[in-house]
Amino acid sequence: MEPAPLVRPRSYVVRGRKTDAQQRAIAEFWPAFGVDFAGGLLDLDALFGRTAPRTVEIGFGNGENLLALAERHPERDFLGVEVHGAGVGRVFAAMRERGLSNIRVIRHDAVEVFETGLSAGSVAEALLFFPDPWPKARHHRRRLVQPDVVRLLARALAADGVLRLATDWEPYADHMLAVLDAEPVLVNVAGPGAFIPRPEARPVTKFERRGEKLGHSIFDLEYRPLP
């Protein structure tokens, strides 16, 4: 019996325009720091030119979190996966300004990257912060946090790895909690049915500030592989 096909939510809509500066940054930095992903297994040691703990951020948006963490942890490597060109250009421009070299960027669907590009146990930390909540009921199937996707994320985590998530949309937070708690190979660090306190180490980004301005609570989740 063949396995059921993977359910791939189309969790994004490509929008926004790159500024001239962002376009120039992409043209200048893509050869060194961009990854032309075509579906094959990635050689992370070759991409980064070293062996180090790897953090993968899914949908890094304008790159605030990715850049802050890369600057704070030069001993780690950071792989950002984003479909929007404006965010990619902003990250490259900021890398130039800050002198960062420990970031690589893939402009591709994150589900496919985790499915075919990342080997089992290759990721020390996976981050999914403030993904599109798709609040309308008819769009819930487009939410990125779905059982099949969670299994892919769990597979990529190292034995001592960690999956961190955050959202300011309470119904999506409850959905995340239910899906992740149901994954048998992951353990909720806060305990079943619970969220963790906001980690001080997580940089504050515009998405969090916007949520708080709207009066939304912030929900953080943290999962580790089952020992």
UniProtKB/Swiss-Prot annotation:
Gene this protein is translated from: trmB
PANTHER family on file: 3-DEOXY-D-MANNO-OCTULOSONIC-ACID TRANSFERASE/TRNA GUANINE-N 7 - -METHYLTRANSFERASE, PENTACOTRIPEPTIDE-REPEAT REGION OF PRORP DOMAIN-CONTAINING PROTEIN
Active site: residue positions: 132
Matches recorded under Gene3D superfamilies: Vaccinia Virus protein VP39
Superkingdom assignment: Bacteria
GO CC terms of this entry: tRNA methyltransferase complex
Catalytic activities: guanosine(46) in tRNA + S-adenosyl-L-methionine = N(7)-methylguanosine(46) in tRNA + S-adenosyl-L-homocysteine
Entry's Gene Ontology molecular function annotations: tRNA (guanine(46)-N7)-methyltransferase activity
Name of the featured protein: tRNA (guanine-N(7)-)-methyltransferase
Claim: Mitochondrion is one of the keywords in the record: no
Organism: Leifsonia xyli subsp. xyli (strain CTCB07)
